[in-house]
């Protein structure tokens, strides 16, 4: 297992936000909003998958993830780490290596041929599984994987997102109702704070981004997107 250092949570969040800007994983576009998978219009977009291409950044982020899990969940609370298809798979491998745990990955749907598996790798019945994704918005995709693991006999009480939107009350309710504790390193508030500090955008763009973070569904509805999220 990798030797862990337990940095201050706020420092980790700030550093991850800075690294995401440095590798150009973050994009602001208030005048031409992005369309998210949920149907929302958003002035912000983030591609955490880029982390896998920057070894020094990737290593630091995964060290932070491992230290957060051990500090907040415990050292002996998991039997394996699961990544969701597809973005979560490499991060599950990186985290499993650091925690010295086996790894599995979960398909969005059974593969439809052969043994029709949805879970790949070995997961004993009753295994305590930590699910990791690169990011989560309102928790919907993570629960696709959590539900599959539970249906196969695994136990999931914790989830890990390297980046968490942190702006939807629906997400808090979903994790609470699903009896899963979500751990995360950075949020959009951390990213916006770095953008302001480093003056990366003009004031109007930053104001629009802040307006979105304060009332995302209202902003989406005004800009051609959905004004409410699906409950499932």
UniProtKB/Swiss-Prot annotation:
Molecular functions (GO terms): magnesium ion binding; orotate phosphoribosyltransferase activity
Enzyme class: transferase
Record pathway: Pyrimidine metabolism; UMP biosynthesis via de novo pathway; UMP from orotate: step 1/2
Pfam family, one: Pribosyltran
InterPro entries the record matches: OPRT, Or_phspho_trans_dom, PRibTrfase_dom, PRTase-like
Binding of orotate, residues: 137
Obligatory cofactor(s): Mg(2+)
SUPFAM superfamilies, per the entry: PRTase-like (SSF53271)
The UniProt record lists the keyword Glycosyltransferase: yes
UniProt keyword terms in alphabetical order: Glycosyltransferase, Magnesium, Pyrimidine biosynthesis, Transferase
Residues given in the record as 5-phospho-alpha-D-ribose 1-diphosphate binding sites: 107-108, 111, 113, 133-141
GO biological process: 'de novo' UMP biosynthetic process; pyrimidine nucleobase biosynthetic process
Catalysis performed (reactions): orotidine 5'-phosphate + diphosphate = orotate + 5-phospho-alpha-D-ribose 1-diphosphate
EC number(s) from the headed UniProt entry: 2.4.2.10
Assembly: Homodimer.
Family label: Belongs to the purine/pyrimidine phosphoribosyltransferase family. PyrE subfamily.
NCBIfam families in the record: PRK00455.1-3, pyrE
PANTHER family hit by this protein: OROTATE PHOSPHORIBOSYLTRANSFERASE (PTHR19278), URIDINE 5'-MONOPHOSPHATE SYNTHASE (PTHR19278:SF9)
Functional description taken from the UniProt entry: Catalyzes the transfer of a ribosyl phosphate group from 5-phosphoribose 1-diphosphate to orotate, leading to the formation of orotidine monophosphate (OMP).
Protein name according to UniProt: Orotate phosphoribosyltransferase
